[in-house]
Amino acid sequence: MKSFGSVRSIFMHANSVDLVLMGLGLIGAVGDGFITPIIFFITGLLLNDIGDSSFGDKTFMHAIMKNAVALLYVAGASLVICFVEGYCWTRTGERQASRMREKYLRAVLRQDVGYFDLHVTSTSDVITSVSSDTLVIQDVLSEKLPNFLMSASAFVASYIVGFIMLWRLTIVGFPFFILLLIPGLMCGRALINISRKIREEYNEAGSIAEQAISLVRTVYAFGSERKMISKFSAALEGSVKLGLRQGIAKGIAIGSNGVTYAIWGFMTWYGSRMVMYHGAKGGTIFAVIICITYGGTSLGRGLSNLKYFSEAVVAGERIIEVIKRVPDIDSDNPRGQVLENIKGEVQFKHVKFMYSSRPETPIFDDLCLRIPSGKSVALVGGSGSGKSTVISLLQRFYDPIVGEILIDGVSIKKLQVKWLRSQMGLVSQEPALFATSIEENILFGKEDASFDEVVEAAKSSNAHDFISQFPLGYKTQVGERGVQMSGGQKQRISIARAIIKSPTLLLLDEATSALDSESERVVQEALDNATIGRTTIVIAHRLSTIRNVDVICVFKNGQIVETGSHEELMENVDGQYTSLVRLQIMENEESNDNVSVSMREGQFSNFNKDVKYSSRLSIQSRSSLFATSSIDTNLAGSIPKDKKPSFKRLMAMNKPEWKHALYGCLSAVLYGALHPIYAYASGSMVSVYFLTSHDEMKEKTRIYVLLFVGLAVLCFLISIIQQYSFAYMGEYLTKRIRENILSKLLTFEVSWFDEDENSSGSICSRLAKDANVVRSLVGERVSLLVQTISAVSVACTLGLAISWKLSIVMIAIQPVVVGCFYTQRIVLKSISKKAIKAQDESSKLAAEAVSNIRTITAFSSQERILKLLKMVQEGPQRENIRQSWLAGIVLATSRSLMTCTSALNYWYGARLIIDGKITSKAFFELFILFVSTGRVIADAGAMTMDLAKGSDAVGSVFAVLDRYTNIEPEKPDGFVPQNIKGQIKFVNVDFAYPTRPDVIIFKNFSIDIDEGKSTAIVGPSGSGKSTIIGLIERFYDPLKGIVKIDGRDIRSYHLRSLRQHIGLVSQEPILFAGTIRENIMYGGASDKIDESEIIEAAKAANAHDFIVTLSDGYDTYCGDRGVQLSGGQKQRIAIARAVLKNPSVLLLDEATSALDNQSERMVQDALGRLMVGRTSVVIAHRLSTIQNCDTITVLDKGKVVECGTHSSLLAKGPTGVYFSLVSLQRTRY
């Protein structure tokens, strides 16, 4: 029953139209299976006519013509039947796969957040299911299932024909089909288990690749390319070993078909007795024996599809498991109360909670919290104290273990989940945007909003001005995860998304943390206005942003230790809140004395105008909203003309496995030669049946029986050697290709990854899919090709030796058959790039959806994501209709032409016999030889579809491997620095991001950064601050001018060696899916780092204390992108990683923005010590963190407008830009 359920999972996505298509396809496949046994029946009659010498010439030709015409009728019937088979299965395969992708993604988006914490270790899992798994099932439905049905019906039809022709012989031969089934079933079970394990093994490797590509800036910055490739390579070893086991199992399964020869030997012997003692005719004996063996081998061919069925079953089970899973917190459940008039009073009553992924670490033990309706409440406290968990519980991302949460006195468990979330607007600490337009991103907050509402929301969040500067305005693409926007711009768009929702409850989790001072002031005012009349929960580390809230709750270790207004809490001089406030008061008393808030108004009336210009400068948006080129197209222009994808080059990559290639090819040649030898012996044996001497018949029968038994033994042994050898070649070639592709990808310039079509989901999907197709090409198709060439060569040689006249005619018509299947290849290869793009786009959507699942869940945006999926699949679905027609026509033509060629062979052979040019014995030998060879060619022709896919995959592989990298990290003649002093100089630099060459970031830009000194870069969002870091890391090259380090052009360095001397801590902490220890070790130059060094680095970053409180300590799993840790915890680990690197140049891009006050002070002290003696470039919006820097450089519109120390810049007074920035941030207590 379980097996039936598993197989059923493949078809559970069919609707009524698909059932009709599958019904018609079933009729076509069954009819296709009956055609060949019917041909055998007619062939038996023809052979009897030819072998019977009692016919006269006229009578003889009349009988031949009668049966030849019958074959033509069969050919006509096969034309219709095979068209129905080809069209219906191809069409329904695509329809069901498309529906499956939608259902799977819908089910994934339906799951609660806790499911992702426990079951989805990385986005790679979902990408694989959306792309690879659905493709496997589509392939089975479109090609492998109809082949299996045709083979099964051929088995049944063969025995029906056998019983009609000679029931006694058929009964004797009937039990032998079991000999073909038992080995196949045993090996099939092994193949299912191995296939399941291979999929699980590759998940780990796929996850590593996805991280390396999606976090490529971090990988480059820490020189971790080799580490990632080494981890990727090690993760692939398990799947390679399983692949070799799969090769042996397949060799046994296919080799077991050699029992056919032994069966043929026995049946030949028994048939001779039927001729001698029961008056049976030789043609009838041959037809019955070939029906019996064909029926058995048909099942054998069906079992050869077992690998694909096993993969499809595994994929179907995995997909249906997610589809059927009903989450504990079901956003699709319509049941639940909907409050008519919600006021927004929130109450936590004795809540106990711990994350299911870390049950040993309690977050709340007995939390009680009341938030009055219409009031604003701020939650403050140390990083990891449970502030963000309050918001997660309120939105029902999780449910408490004990206690309850009430809204307006009603438990949120009793409320309809979707309605509950629709009443809340969320702005998270790390802004999550989707790879679509700015307008679409804002509409995630309110799907039916008008464009005017979008604009109004953008104005309210101070986003409208910078959006309007883009050539495409609100249609500008933000890139994968918003990569084309600066941090402040992303945050403002996410705030607009929350504002447009007009929620009853507003949830702000560090909503202004990424904004510069001016933007923060304006956005804070907008947020203050938005909170009026709404219940608002604010989480903030910057206490100046929450001093006006109604109530402030101070958290510590999951408990509320203080509650009150700002003024009330400040009265307790020894209180926790007062201590936090003190940490944020600017230490430089000079700034307090000199700054006058009243002086800043005039300055910023002009400054605000400048922001409109500068805010657009750091954008790397798309040049077109409708970019549709695939990865291959994007790469094609960069491939050197002397390097073209070819099968020869692919085989050259298999050179290390040359011994196995030799063994595999020799065994394939031998295996291929077995079939024509068997066919020749069968033809000779038919002539033996027409001998008049029983003694001679017995003697020759004995010889041929021994020959057939010998062929059976050789078939079994050779098959195992052949399949293992080619599996060895395929597995190691696949491993090498994946390693080489990832290695090559990690040499590409960052701007390549900025392109919309080169998203991590799309690349990982191709990495998995293309490599698998290449493995099938080498491990299976090349093997079949070699043995087919061997079989054809031996057959032609034998045929020409027997009778060159008939052989030439029979050989001449073989290309017709081959041509039909070659056309199939061309048809498949002509599938439009829309179909390829559909897979890539689906993978990209899935990757984004999982990465931003909290945002999707919070805004109930599942339907919007599914609409995007439907849009990207519309084109390929239309294309599939045309392809289904072509598939049906080509299949029907090839089948019918094969039957027509048999009729031609009979007619021409009969003419030669009448003319005395050949004997009937020669005709039997040649006919069976070439008909058998024709079927070998036809079976091999079926692989042309796989060859077409393989050709595309090979092209895709070499498109990556041959691409010229604009910024080569391993420049052979590059200067390898032993030590870096850290003198950095920008000389007349012009720069624009490659994805938006028309927007100039820097024009004739120059700046000097002294060695061993600390330089702070400040200015409004989008003024080019982060671009300086990107150029120092050489993520990009300037269009004009030079960036120098230690007086040498940065382009002359060996890039990876140079980056070893540069440490980076980014604005958004980027962690890999691994343990805390592994993440810190990414800062080390080698894989062997002492535990003491790791601990010291963690202590320096104020991370050690919280790490040791975790049950697994440094072995705690961080989750995909550090999802298991709080923002502050992630940032401290990222800082520890930089500390361990001990760099000469330290780049800090908002390094402390995610930390609470106490942690920030301690980390700032650690960074202060780390910066001593090093060149440090610090980007900060919080000016209190940079006032001790040796130099402060103020940027505006890509220009340096001020430069000096904190004191000297303040001395300029109200006319100074820096003075005004400090004024905005001055904390007034």
Curated annotation (Swiss-Prot):
Residues 22-311, 661-949 form the ABC transmembrane type-1 domain. PROSITE patterns: ABC_TM1F, ABC_TRANSPORTER_1, ABC_TRANSPORTER_2. Residues 346-582, 984-1222 form the ABC transporter domain. It is found in: Membrane. CDD domains: ABC_6TM_Pgp_ABCB1_D1_like, ABC_6TM_Pgp_ABCB1_D2_like, ABC_MTABC3_MDL1_MDL2. ATP 2 binds at residues 1019-1026. The chain crosses the membrane at residues 22-42, 69-89, 145-167, 171-193, 251-271, 274-294, 661-681, 703-723, 782-800, 807-823, 885-908, 923-943. SMART domains: AAA. It is a multi-pass membrane protein. It holds the Pfam family ABC_membrane. Keywords: ATP-binding, Glycoprotein, Membrane, Nucleotide-binding, Repeat, Transmembrane, Transmembrane helix, Transport. GO terms for molecular function: ABC-type transporter activity; ATP binding; ATP hydrolysis activity. ATP 1 binds at residues 381-388. Its main location: membrane. One of its GO terms (cellular component) is membrane. Glycans are attached at residues 529, 594, 758, 1004, 1157. Belongs to the ABC transporter superfamily. ABCB family. Multidrug resistance exporter (TC 3.A.1.201) subfamily. This is ABC transporter B family member 22. It comes from Arabidopsis thaliana. The gene is ABCB22.
